[in-house]
Amino acid sequence: MGAIGLLWLLPLLLSTAAVGSGMGTGQRAGSPAAGPPLQPREPLSYSRLQRKSLAVDFVVPSLFRVYARDLLLPPSSSELKAGRPEARGSLALDCAPLLRLLGPAPGVSWTAGSPAPAEARTLSRVLKGGSVRKLRRAKQLVLELGEEAILEGCVGPPGEAAVGLLQFNLSELFSWWIRQGEGRLRIRLMPEKKASEVGREGRLSAAIRASQPRLLFQIFGTGHSSLESPTNMPSPSPDYFTWNLTWIMKDSFPFLSHRSRYGLECSFDFPCELEYSPPLHDLRNQSWSWRRIPSEEASQMDLLDGPGAERSKEMPRGSFLLLNTSADSKHTILSPWMRSSSEHCTLAVSVHRHLQPSGRYIAQLLPHNEAAREILLMPTPGKHGWTVLQGRIGRPDNPFRVALEYISSGNRSLSAVDFFALKNCSEGTSPGSKMALQSSFTCWNGTVLQLGQACDFHQDCAQGEDESQMCRKLPVGFYCNFEDGFCGWTQGTLSPHTPQWQVRTLKDARFQDHQDHALLLSTTDVPASESATVTSATFPAPIKSSPCELRMSWLIRGVLRGNVSLVLVENKTGKEQGRMVWHVAAYEGLSLWQWMVLPLLDVSDRFWLQMVAWWGQGSRAIVAFDNISISLDCYLTISGEDKILQNTAPKSRNLFERNPNKELKPGENSPRQTPIFDPTVHWLFTTCGASGPHGPTQAQCNNAYQNSNLSVEVGSEGPLKGIQIWKVPATDTYSISGYGAAGGKGGKNTMMRSHGVSVLGIFNLEKDDMLYILVGQQGEDACPSTNQLIQKVCIGENNVIEEEIRVNRSVHEWAGGGGGGGGATYVFKMKDGVPVPLIIAAGGGGRAYGAKTDTFHPERLENNSSVLGLNGNSGAAGGGGGWNDNTSLLWAGKSLQEGATGGHSCPQAMKKWGWETRGGFGGGGGGCSSGGGGGGYIGGNAASNNDPEMDGEDGVSFISPLGILYTPALKVMEGHGEVNIKHYLNCSHCEVDECHMDPESHKVICFCDHGTVLAEDGVSCIVSPTPEPHLPLSLILSVVTSALVAALVLAFSGIMIVYRRKHQELQAMQMELQSPEYKLSKLRTSTIMTDYNPNYCFAGKTSSISDLKEVPRKNITLIRGLGHGAFGEVYEGQVSGMPNDPSPLQVAVKTLPEVCSEQDELDFLMEALIISKFNHQNIVRCIGVSLQSLPRFILLELMAGGDLKSFLRETRPRPSQPSSLAMLDLLHVARDIACGCQYLEENHFIHRDIAARNCLLTCPGPGRVAKIGDFGMARDIYRASYYRKGGCAMLPVKWMPPEAFMEGIFTSKTDTWSFGVLLWEIFSLGYMPYPSKSNQEVLEFVTSGGRMDPPKNCPGPVYRIMTQCWQHQPEDRPNFAIILERIEYCTQDPDVINTALPIEYGPLVEEEEKVPVRPKDPEGVPPLLVSQQAKREEERSPAAPPPLPTTSSGKAAKKPTAAEISVRVPRGPAVEGGHVNMAFSQSNPPSELHKVHGSRNKPTSLWNPTYGSWFTEKPTKKNNPIAKKEPHDRGNLGLEGSCTVPPNVATGRLPGASLLLEPSSLTANMKEVPLFRLRHFPCGNVNYGYQQQGLPLEAATAPGAGHYEDTILKSKNSMNQPGP
């Protein structure tokens, strides 16, 4: 059967009391091969204490017994019966050093220090090691080793026995101890007591140490035993596997000698740990190398001036090294690796000096990883013969070796060395040896693995023995693949709606060999932020200094909008200590399993693991963990060093990169050198995201510092609440920079705040010192505020505070508006429980409500701790908190001993309107109308009388006398405070005591004063040499000037050539673009790209061209033209390939010409953006756009029914032609338009042109749906309460409310008014509103309170909707939700829907649309103006109010007052009323007067039957005296806009001529017109055109009319001019 083995190799450096100094130069014995001793110098016997010092003690801790039994022995009795494990042990020593002590056998030669043969060691006889009875009685086992035991154990031929092992059988002892024993296992190995042989015990003790004794512990199953040969494993049966784990005790440093790390003494009486070059030989014929010979042999040699004749009397006899050579060569003696902890470490070498020296001695120090340096040897003065050479070694940082070189000069050079020692290399007691266990696992085929590779879910042995059933028998949680459940992992607090960790199969992972169960968490379909925690079983504390590791596989699939952390929690006394060992955040996984190894360092107590996952909305990820294991190294391996020198970063790798056949390589886990400390590292402490009067919490600081090198503990109660506690990492000089927080801003002066103070000091700190750091927080600002009343004060709309100040000269009732004081930043230590301040950086005072901008408070600094740290004086506002004062005022900042919380606002401010301006954490005082005081060592004072112009004072800063002030206190911080700690760079070696460190090379570079440079030595500064000019200045200037002129000439010539070529290309391109063939081809085949990308805001969200649905040009087919739109031609077309739509789809295509202005392009794209954002059944749908090619297209839904106005006119009932319409049809049309308007209103859009001409029908027959179709004048009012129209514009006057054409204000209520006019159009069947009235008359009529009569046969409820829409005050008009509700009531009223439509007896539609023929030269005929003669006739006539139109609903018309007289233009009699058909007798003239000459291709006719007569400015070449005066008159008006009156103004009467009216002409012609009505006109920016039909008017220029200027209107327009 196979065997399960545990092999312990425990070197003698365990808890040994070995004494190497007991065999010095005064303790020698003759060599057994050199004859009888001459002068015995050793004692006859050793005392008990001396014998104890010769022993080697092994102490195996009891914790190892517990862990080995729990982890490696089967727990159940059934398993014991099936194959009871056998625990065996032995103590092994190398035979070679022991046989050297006995002397070489005849015919056998051996060399001290020579390596063992390469072949395997010979099997040796195992000696009996002792019994359990002795161990239980004496609590330890003592083994004595003598010559008989050496000869019995090291058996075999002499050549093979020298490389064998001497072993003591300890199987019975170890088997009992591992199963039933208690306490530690103590084994003492010591020399056998031989009193008859003087000095034999000392030499035997040294030989035992040189033989490297170790303990071999094994645990085997039933089967072959390998105790006799730990290196030769039994041949296992193929049906079984074999476990064999080797544990080795070694010294803490791999290359240090096992004898003494801190001292060495060698007298060459027996083999030492020295190395020789050439190697040491004992044969006489080897004259070229070192030889070890007794002194008696040297005295018999015939050596001139040799050691035997000239040896000093005081020197004892014995063996020494001899070198006798005639060649010029170098011979070396090399010490083992050593350490030194004392500055007095010295090398002492006893050599023989001849009268005529033929060589010299040189000693060198060889530190590890450093260059060698020579040791100066000082001989004993004035002495030849035997003398001592001494050299100082000191205290090197790294381990070192010492080399003694003898350089011969030929001619029979002779060297003799009697003594080699390193003395005084340790201070105090030398540290004892440390337990070091190195483990390995041997597969049955001999493959050696590290113990950490066993039970790690990766098969490293060929037959898989390392992942066999034994791994599954480990305690719960040690080896978990979740195939049998949660393996001891438990959920946190469970909630019915919280996602939970589950154990199930992840089938779609991208690792085909990993399809088993795993621990999963799904973050998908969670509406809000959630978190989930799962906790492992509790694990025992690892052995100290063990290379403990956690191994696991993890996977994230999908997008994780959160983080996952692995936290290690120790069961410390009191509070649980948790630290994060792994973290991943905002991860986009690829469903790929990752393998990760995490080192678990400095774990000294029982611990458990927690997986904490947090995610937010939108996270769609699955987090999985599997194959979690704790390495056996945690409990069965000890490195021998206090700290594990390894990289603490997780070793994570892809599972595909894992090599399953990787074997252990020599030196793979050798300790790394301690990294050099980076002096550029600094620690930055912040508020951890906290603000206000209270400090941060532990969770906030953990989150803030999770990706930094900071780890703090935050106080949670008492005066230390919110204070960060930090441990100093190393003893050094540190630079501590403290920054206080700024004060809050006042209500009026929001531009400046009081800055926090910075203090920088230099302090000496010790390692593990605890620094208490309170980071000050900014005082709260008075503005802005979420309180609407306070916000009005902030923006200046409410002046109640100023009014109270003006009346009472103080503020009491309306107190508030001052900023809170900033908190101070404290850095202090604790001494006997009392805080000791190091640095205090004061906070800035809060600014007052009406603070002045020129106030200045100088910085104040205190360094005398005897000065009391008092709070600042408090008034209405709170004073700042100090160091150790008390206060009972809630609005005052608290001192540090009271918790340093910020003060609240004054009670007056909180009581009146809840104006909260609290002080910042760190003792900031609360604000009132005056500012709060800043915190500090002494708090800042606040104003005593609530002066609204008095700021709070800054606090007083402090620096401890223990430190050095590096820079003066300065006010620099504009926000929260900070603390920055870094290593202080010592620049004392520099000439100016200032330096910096190069961030790349980490070298210190000194600064120099201005005008000097750093010398080559890197320390001193020298004056920079002034370079002498080599060429005259005149020559340099002439060359530069000539080159510059030549360059300018060449550049100018090149520019002209390029310009001429570009000009010619542009002309050719313009000619090509103007050709009709090019335009037609571009409509179908153009592929010119555009990069224009405007932004538009819809309902608070930014939109751009990228949001539009782009339709490829190849999918668009143009069929026929439909007309001319606002930008270009409109075509009927078809679109194919549109998803969710029939193919082909009939569309209307609006085009933008290629040659257009930038404003036209912007307006076109803006309309596309607006229409594309609407999604309503009563708004024309935007199918898509085609903007990537020229000309650009907008694809709209094709409305076959045409516009609503034409439809109503065509379907009027006539005597000869009854209509298919009913009153219910008209109500349905009105309801559809109201639904669309409600949608626009809810999305904060104003259409500004709701009229029948802009509404389209899906079909003319039944089932028609009305939709709003033109958005050329729509505007987004999401961010403003109204839209003010400015500039030059043409507006539909008859559809506009008074505030729109009087003041240019457009709101959603504007569309309500327009909808009332639309209702009138619908129920009048397409008549022009305000029949027989011109635009000017409509202005007068509406502003005087007049409203239209109901259309013929209009139901009363419908007319009431119209009148409610025509309310004078916008807030009195209903919204469209109410309008829809009332229209629905009308559709259910039988009296309404049964009302018959009126029969039309007027002219046909074709006749209504006709317009009188215009003259061929319209420019020669001026538009009509109000004549001066008419004005004079009105002045002579008695003043009488003009007749008002009939008011709505049959109400009697009010008699207008003098202030309400409308401006009327004298005209002929006209029929008034709501149903006169004269308005529709107009037609479009084919005159050139109305063509548009702008950049847009507008309709060629300016006549619009809906808008009336539009007017455009066009200069004329005819001379006219009135025209010469007109520009001057308009220039004096001070009006905005670019619209001007045509200068060709003449008197005349022309039917249908346009009448131009300006505010100036109104005021000049009608003196009784009230100015308050006219000053709200758009100041000439909007030209209102209207037509008069058959009215005899005489136009004349009114004197002084052009000089009218409304100063109020001018100032208003100059101050408030919103954009269109």
Swiss-Prot record:
UniProt GO molecular function: ATP binding; heparin binding; identical protein binding; protein tyrosine kinase activity; receptor signaling protein tyrosine kinase activator activity; transmembrane receptor protein tyrosine kinase activity
Disordered: region residues: 650-674, 1408-1463, 1514-1540
Main location: membrane
Topological relation to the membrane, as annotated: Single-pass type I membrane protein
Tissue-specific expression: Expressed in brain and CNS. Also expressed in the small intestine and testis, but not in normal lymphoid cells.
Site (Breakpoint for translocation to form the EML4-ALK fusion protein (variant 1)): 1057-1058
Phosphotyrosine, modified sites: 1078, 1092, 1096, 1131, 1278, 1507, 1604
Impact noted for substituting residue 1166 to R: In NBLST3; somatic mutation
Entry superkingdom: Eukaryota
Protein activity control: Activated upon ALKAL2 ligand-binding. ALKAL2-driven activation is coupled with heparin-binding. Following ligand-binding, homodimerizes and autophosphorylates, activating its kinase activity. Inactivated through dephosphorylation by receptor protein tyrosine phosphatase beta and zeta complex (PTPRB/PTPRZ1) when there is no stimulation by a ligand. Staurosporine, crizotinib and CH5424802 act as inhibitors of ALK kinase activity.
The MAM domain, residue ranges: 264-427, 478-636
Effect of residue 1174 to L: In NBLST3; somatic mutation; constitutively activated; retained in the endoplasmic reticulum and Golgi compartments
Enzyme class: transferase
GO cellular component terms listed in the entry, alphabetical order: extracellular exosome; plasma membrane; protein-containing complex; receptor complex
Annotated site (Breakpoint for translocation to form the EML4-ALK fusion protein (variant 2)): 1058-1059
Membrane side Extracellular: residue ranges: 19-1038
Domain annotation Protein kinase: ranges: 1116-1392
Subcellular location: Cell membrane
Binding site for ATP: 1124, 1150, 1197-1199, 1270
Protein family membership: Belongs to the protein kinase superfamily. Tyr protein kinase family. Insulin receptor subfamily.
Entry domain remark: The EGF-like region drives the cytokine specificity for ALKAL2.
Protein name (database record): ALK tyrosine kinase receptor
Organism: Homo sapiens
